[in-house]
Amino acid sequence: MKKKYSFRKFSNDIHLWLGIASGLVLFVVCLTGTILTFEKEIVEWADSERYHVEAAAGATVIPIDELVAKTEAGLKGKVTGIEIPANPNAVYRFTVQEKGPKGGKPEEGKGDRMKNAEGGGMKKAEAGPGAKAEGPKGGKGGGGKTYLVNPYNGDITGTTKSATAEFFSTMMGLHRWLLLQDSGGKIIVGAATIIFVFLVLSGLVLWWPIKLRNWKQGFQIKFSGNWKRINHDLHNTLGFYSFVVLLIMALTGLCWSFEWYKTGVSDVLGDEVFKQRREKPMPSDPMNAGNAAKPMLASLISSADQSFPYEGNYRLRFPADSAGSYVINKSRSGFFVLTAADKIQFEQYTGAVLKTEKFSDKPFNEQVASSVRSLHLGDIYGTFSKIIYFLACLFATSLPVTGTIIWINKLRKKNKKQAAGKRRVQRLQQHQATTVVV
């Protein structure tokens, strides 16, 4: 009697054939995603002579306004943004619009790459104060370039460009569009990501035990078994333990891949995803230019500290024109902290507070919409969540490999059964022929 085609069998077929169709692409995307998880930490470690400073005992940082003046004088350019880390042994990052005969694009750092992708793919992103806000743009005088500055003596230790940074840029290109930026790579990655969502869901159906007494098997790997059993358990168990994080990665990553998807998510949340990309600072009144002394950056940072009284990282964005304003984003730093930034804007001529945005005061839907990037990258809760994302992405990288091995083993088993069946038929036919002859 023919077996009924069950939902479980349907899920198995979906899981198998979609996995075969997308396995190679998903392997590349997950592997590069794993590598990119700790991009910032690896770059700063590999190029530590640029990013790390040792302060002498009792040394104090140069006041920020003096540091800006010294940097502008030394580089003969205009500072358009600053990143000030909470770590006292880390350099400041200054984005400088250098004077030159030709304007251009700002130097791309990790955050700038991610911003440029906001409208298209699963990109990771840091560097430069524009990383989580709007990146400083090049103008008539030249492009914005990110310099690393020692806050204790004002020396420039280098820029964010290096062989290590170039390596991660290549990893980003693979992760985002398989190095096929203008040849449909984004669509291929996006389609594979949609398939991945179905693979995770169908895999969960297949993991679900038919009998209650088999629940325990789904939570552990039987290392005492043969290699086929271990491979099966690795695929089954690691997939289960990581499925929640993998779904979050995939569902948020699609916001870069397809505009229609991003629009749909924005409609569901009731708030625009990546709206920071188009959001303009509050306007300043140019009529105030001659009526007041220009505010000191130190006083603006002090005012931000009063609104957000905690130790953290700062990202300062300077006014882009006579009607622009100063924007300061402040975020917590630590092993297990919510890294979402609070934001405050100041009138550029008077230093008056124009707008204060505290992340915790936002409605939940706006918090989610503004956290899509962090939910995809895994830095939503600092190093703690990055470790979890790293492991989940590493597990995901192994799934196409272990899944392919399971499929090959089943094919071999099926072929052996078919061969054994043919041999039985042949023996039976020979026996019948012998009987007839006798």
Question: What is each model feature region?
Answer:
Residues 1-438:
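Conserved histidines in hydrophobic membrane contexts and catalytic metal-binding motifs
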